[in-house]
């Protein structure tokens, strides 16, 4: 039995929106995700937009068109909700490309009913990964025109109801799909996902720090520009310094005739000020031209952009890993159920065999068959404890229960 899978999450900044845009529209040159088959990327398609979009600009346009709230939108308001719709490979293996597209068309129909057609940003189907899936995005505008991700997404209970409605929608369209169990229902709070989220949050914070550095650099640059301009203005002002013309006697020793030498005499204090101004002019001229030309800011912006690209790639790698892990987990659910059924059947058969042979003969045969296989022997012992708990001490039962709990947690990771 295949499953209907729908996920939704809030996107908390324009930077993350840009990262999602690059992943959804395949804008990066290289991807760490090995599941992407670039030879099939041309098969991807968007059911909303004919051409690639700038998601942040598109969000602003949607808000301009559909927001009717009276309050000014906060700068930290969540303007973007991102989600994913898919099933498992067993389902898609039995679908032609046209059938797959029709499935996602029905999924888009559901999204339009839930969020409003005008609020849908994109519905991009990826056919170049192992399992076809659709990324979708919406602006969280309520029916009465307010921007509220909290109200549109809702709490855990609302998310569960949302997943129920999606499963019912696809069933009504003729798809025999079971509802994928939510992580809230199964309590599958995986340590790896938590680590991915922590790393994602780290990169978000790292970007914020770099952005603050950029703002600080720009402010410092503006301040330096003002100081340099002030120094230049000072240098351009006419200098009114008291001075005397230097003279010398001409003629004989007793002559009183004097003439100007062409030099001037100023005070030591004024001379020192001249030296300071000359030094200031020398110091600022090269730096001023560097800043005035824009090269300083361009160089710093280039450095910040390079760091920004690295952070976006890191965030994308983490989000891809998160998606892949969730997909693997969903695909593993039927296997886990089959294993549990097989174990139940095995216990029934072994119990019947023990009844027919007698416990002692049964134990001897099992020990003989597994004496060279320690793991099999241990498994047989564990099964026996489950089939005949009354034959074991309370302490042994508690130890076995603890082992089972650890094993179950391992199966959820």
From Swiss-Prot:
Q: What is this protein called?
A: Plasmid recombination enzyme type 3
UniProt keyword Nucleotide-binding present:
no
| Function in brief | The interaction of the RSA site and the PRE protein may not only serves a function in plasmid maintenance, but may also contributes to the distribution of small antibiotic resistance plasmids among Gram-positive bacteria.
Q: Name one GO molecular function term.
A: DNA binding
Species in which this protein is naturally found: Mammaliicoccus lentus
User: Any other comment in the entry?
Assistant: Contains conserved positively charged amino acids probably involved in the binding of the pre protein to the RSA site.
Protein's gene? pre
Report any Pfam family annotated for this entry: Mob_Pre
The record's family statement is:
Belongs to the plasmid mobilization pre family.
């Amino acid at each position: 039995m295949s499953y209907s899978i729908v996920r939704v999450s809030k996107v908390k900044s324009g930077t993350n929106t840009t990262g999602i845009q690059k992943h959804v529209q395949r804008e990066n040159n290289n991807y760490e995700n090995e599941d992407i088959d670039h030879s099939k990327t041309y098969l991807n398609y968007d059911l909303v937009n004919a051409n690639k979009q700038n998601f942040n600009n598109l969000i602003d346009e949607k808000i301009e068109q559909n927001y009717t709230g009276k309050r000014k939108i906060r700068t930290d308001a969540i303007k973007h909700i991102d989600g994913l719709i898919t099933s498992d490979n067993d389902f898609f293996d039995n679908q032609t490309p046209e059938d797959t597209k029709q499935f996602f068309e029905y999924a888009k129909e559901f999204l339009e009913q839930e969020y409003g057609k005008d609020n849908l940003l994109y519905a991009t189907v990826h056919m170049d990964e192992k399992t076809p899936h659709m990324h979708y995005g919406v602006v969280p505008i309520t029916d009465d025109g307010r921007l509220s991700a909290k109200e549109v997404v809702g709490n855990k209970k609302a998310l569960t109801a949302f997943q129920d409605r999606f499963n019912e929608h696809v069933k009504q369209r003729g798809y025999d799909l079971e509802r994928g169990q939510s992580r809230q229902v199964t309590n599958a709070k995986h340590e790896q996902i938590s680590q991915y989220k922590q790393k994602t949050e780290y990169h978000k914070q790292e970007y914020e720090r770099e952005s603050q550095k950029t703002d600080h650099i720009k402010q410092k640059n503006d301040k330096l520009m003002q100081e340099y301009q002030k120094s230049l203005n000072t240098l351009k002002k006419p200098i009114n310094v008291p001075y005397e013309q230097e003279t010398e006697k001409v003629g004989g020793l007793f002559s009183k005739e004097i003439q100007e030498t062409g030099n001037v005499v100023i005070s030591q204090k004024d001379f020192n000020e001249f030296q300071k101004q000359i030094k200031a002019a020398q110091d600022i001229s090269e730096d001023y031209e560097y800043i005035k030309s824009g090269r300083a800011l361009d160089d710093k912006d280039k450095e910040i952009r390079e760091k920004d690209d690295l952070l976006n790639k890191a965030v994308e790698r983490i989000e891809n890993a998160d998606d892949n892990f969730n997909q693997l987990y969903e695909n593993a659910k039927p296997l886990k159920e089959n294993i549990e059924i097989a174990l139940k059947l095995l216990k029934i058969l072994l119990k019947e065999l023990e009844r027919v042979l007698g416990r002692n003969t049964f134990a001897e045969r099992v020990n003989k068959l597994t004496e060279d296989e320690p793991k099999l022997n241990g498994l047989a012992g564990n099964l026996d404890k489950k089939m005949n708990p009354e034959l074991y001490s309370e302490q042994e039962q508690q130890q076995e229960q603890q082992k089972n709990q650890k094993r179950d947690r391992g199966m959820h990771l």
